[in-house]
């Protein structure tokens, strides 16, 4: 049986300096500079993944390749294992051999959060309208893995003074301050400070988003 490891344990593994832990994966971005170089890197990753029988999600763009690793059989009670750390190190080594640099500050994960009094009644609607599947007790997920996850947050009472839907934006821990500063410079305000785990920001009309770097340093406690 595969055992889960914490984000801290993942970061303690050798060779994973290029990677950051987001909400449900360890991820990085490789700056390939061209589509052909990206294909070359993806082919190397595919060979490593087949050899390990452990396959990442890969997003191939013209000048970059984004790679996300997770051990799916652990979810929803965990998402990283030693297999992810081992493959991450191998992928980074392959990129270095090709002269391709990593830029992990480019990665992020966006999640839609919906406040609900009765999650069991509300969640099926959103799964149906989005073409998603129910996952665990609080989520709806895109079966193809393309769209953002939807997480349902339990409310005890209606809160008419604030929106019922907000975005959770998971960023690398070393990018959180810059992201918050940029949002404030663009007219936003910090309305809740739970740093270093998360901050809630609002736009000039009160629409909210959470900047959440906590998965990148979570110790599992």
Where do the PLM segments sit?
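N-terminal beta-strand motif that seeds the catalytic metal site of vicinal oxygen chelate
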Residues: 1, 96-121, 165-166, 217-221
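Charge-rich, low-complexity N-terminal segments
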Residues: 2-16, 22-26, 31-32, 36-73, ...
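Short, conserved charged micro-motifs
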Residues: 35-40, 77-82, 121-122, 174-179
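Vicinal oxygen chelate
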Residues: 58, 70, 76-82, 101-104, 109-117, 159-177, 199-202, ...
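Core segments of cupin and vicinal oxygen chelate
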Residues: 116-149, 178-179
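Terminal peptide-recognition signature
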Residues: 126, 167, 206
